[in-house]
Amino acid sequence: MKIGRYFILLILVIPVLILRDFTPNNELKYLSIVDEALRDGHFFTFYHQGELYADKPPLYFWLLMLSKWIWGEYNMFGLSLFSIIPALISIYIMNKWVEEDTTASLRWSGSLMLFTSAFFIGSGLVLRMDMLMCMFILLALYTFYKRYSGKGQPRDRFLLPFYIFMAIFSKGPVGFIVPLITMLVFLLVKRDVRSFCRYFGWREWGILSGFCAIWFLGIYLEGGSTYLNNLLFHQTINRAIDSFDHKKAFWYYGVTF
């Protein structure tokens, strides 16, 4: 799909990006967290009104800091680019993935269908890290598929764990769980699950673990063991076992979705 069409999709949402205001429940809270981090000189550990805030990894907050440094203030249009650009890149990845098996008109139709779906465009317009994580997950899966289909390059052995780490660094463990389970299920359907270590072997695990170790070291040096324990156990294991954000029974979400 030609690059001009991606600009068309961007132009369609510019009025929303310019005219909308910040939502008080999430967006203003993120800006408050960033202000507190800039004031106190924290870059790996975050606090909200003095309370420890380990709910989200630092990548998105770093982007908010970058935007404030560029614009000199919290500019809605500038901040929104960190959601809408990953959304457009996600569409580009999907188009690239199916390029050999589809026509240009079919890819354009698919792009419009995805771009106008409620959950996708909704995530692309709000100031959240969801679309950023989606982009990195898609990059990881596309890289895996290239390697599986014999079209990969040597650098993909590094890029696959790097993209997975960036997905984790965007929004936490789901950035790890989704691509790993997807790869396993794909290989299971292909009756080739034993080859999993060929695509994600000791080298890939080592690269992923190395990036995580650097991140955790930064947290420990800045926030100590209390913050690190909250991130690794309270926000990960305890939330998986007994979520404190989503308390409905599992069938509620099945019906809702």
PLM-predicted stretches and their roles:
Residues 1-257:
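Membrane-integral, polyisoprenol-dependent glycosyltransferases
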